From Swiss-Prot:
Limits of the Radical SAM core domain: 99-337
Keywords: 4Fe-4S, Cytoplasm, Disulfide bond, Iron, Iron-sulfur, Metal-binding, Methyltransferase, rRNA processing, S-adenosyl-L-methionine, Transferase, tRNA processing
One GO MF term attached to the UniProt entry: metal ion binding
Additional remarks: Reaction proceeds by a ping-pong mechanism involving intermediate methylation of a conserved cysteine residue.
Disulfide bonds: 106-342
EC numbers for this chain: 2.1.1.192
Cofactor: how bound: Binds 1 [4Fe-4S] cluster. The cluster is coordinated with 3 cysteines and an exchangeable S-adenosyl-L-methionine.
Pfam families: Radical_SAM, RlmN_N
Active site, renumbered: 93, 342
Organism: Dichelobacter nodosus (strain VCS1703A)
Cofactor: [4Fe-4S] cluster
Catalytic activity, reaction form: adenosine(2503) in 23S rRNA + 2 reduced [2Fe-2S]-[ferredoxin] + 2 S-adenosyl-L-methionine = 2-methyladenosine(2503) in 23S rRNA + 5'-deoxyadenosine + L-methionine + 2 oxidized [2Fe-2S]-[ferredoxin] + S-adenosyl-L-homocysteine; adenosine(37) in tRNA + 2 reduced [2Fe-2S]-[ferredoxin] + 2 S-adenosyl-L-methionine = 2-methyladenosine(37) in tRNA + 5'-deoxyadenosine + L-methionine + 2 oxidized [2Fe-2S]-[ferredoxin] + S-adenosyl-L-homocysteine
Descriptive protein name: Dual-specificity RNA methyltransferase RlmN
């Protein structure tokens, strides 16, 4: 028997092609996707504008795979974290951050992460595998459902999606790209390009490839203003150095001017990357690339070799960048009391690749 397809894996075009292969009209895809994404209905028998024959065919050949919600926590500040478990027993985490004028959902692209950045708790958990397109998309679908049920039916509360959870999205390019297409499709979640952000640690070839097919918002986990330091705290820099990264981002920003350019993420680590000398190096490095700098207070976790910079040092760093002509903001820490803040997402990663030595021997 042929394995059933998971509808969450399919973009509108891919699903239309699938219907044609079944001897059906391509417009059936939009009918089904409207039920799935707009009405949040995945029981084919409830798709009342489909014929009985078509519903029977869908029941035989297609399905919707939902993960199990094994944890649902709400922080003091209203941030909400879910742990989703897939059939393979790996679990990943997604975080909803409500604000007065928006609701941001942070989702994962991999079970774990192989990049071994020593300031990130996710990296310590190791890496198992890439998530499928459907496993990425369903995080948004299920989060909308869970928020909808508790917020008087207001499904518009999730206004932004950021691929900043577990994993490096651009290593999982072939699964992430269709997911972003579904996020932005009118027959999917209908988000605008400026409301979908992909965060990368700097997979340079994939940034070039991404530029050729989309112009969604791009964030770069920079964290250091020179190669010597970045080689230590963002190890992928040993493969793709700052010169190549900045050049790739400058080209991407040319396609992305209407979205404000690149968002540069910079975690503030006490005594490591937080001096005014580092700020000057950062200002020089980013001089010709439009964008903004987001300073992130480090969120500590057990046995971490790092501490967060003092608030005074973070503000001093910000003010230096602002005087140098940059838009520089300090990210407000959200959800740290439930381990939902930046760098704290772990989930459960089975058959993982351990990275302990990366943490034990760090020296700034």
């Amino acid at each position: 028997m042929t394995e059933k397809i998971n509808l969450f894996d399919y973009t509108p075009k891919a699903l239309a092609d699938w219907f044609v292969a079944q001897g059906e009209q391509p417009f059936r895809a939009k009918q089904v996707l409207k039920w799935l994404y707009h009405e949040r209905v995945y029981d084919f028998e409830r798709m009342t504008d489909l014929s009985k024959k078509l519903r029977a065919m869908l029941s035989e050949k297609a399905c919707v795979i939902l993960p199990q919600v094994i944890a649902d926590k709400t922080a003091r500040d209203g941030t909400r974290k879910w742990v989703f478990q897939y059939a393979c027993t790996n679990s990943i985490e997604a975080v909803f951050i409500p604000e007065d004028d928006r609701g941001t959902l942070c989702i994962s692209s991999q079970a774990g992460c192989a990049l071994a950045c020593p300031f990130c708790s996710t990296a310590r958990a190791g890496f198992n595998r890439n998530l499928t397109t459907g496993e990425i998309v369903v995080q948004v679908w299920l989060a909308k459902e869970l928020v909808h049920c508790e917020r008087n039916g207001n499904s518009r509360l999730i206004t932004n999606v950021v691929l900043m959870g577990m994993g490096e999205p651009l290593i999982n390019f072939n699964q992430v790209l269709p997911a972003t297409e579904i996020f932005m499709s009118d027959w999917g979640f209908g988000l605008s390009k400026r409301r979908v952000t992909l965060s990368t640690s700097g997979v340079v070839p994939a940034i070039h490839k991404l530029r050729e097919v989309t112009d969604l918002s791009l964030a770069v986990s920079l964290h250091a203003p020179n190669d010597e330091l970045r080689n230590k705290i963002v190890p992928i820099n040993q493969r793709y150095g700052l010169k190549a990264l900045i050049e790739a981002c400058a080209l991407y920003a040319e396609n992305n001017k209407q979205h404000g350019g690149i968002t540069w993420e910079y975690v503030m680590l006490k005594g490591v990357n937080d001096t005014l000398e580092h700020a000057q190096q950062l200002a020089d490095l980013l001089r010709n690339v439009p964008g903004k700098i987001n300073l992130i207070p480090f969120n500590e976790f057990p046995n971490s070799p790092f501490q967060c910079s003092s608030w005074e040092d973070i503000v001093r760093f910000q003010q230096f960048l602002q005087k140098a002509g940059y838009i520089a903001t300090i990210r407000k820490t959200r959800g740290d009391d439930i381990d939902a803040a930046c760098g704290q997402l772990v989930g459960r990663v089975n058959d993982r690749i351990r990275r302990e030595r990366q943490f034990q021997g760090f020296k700034a």
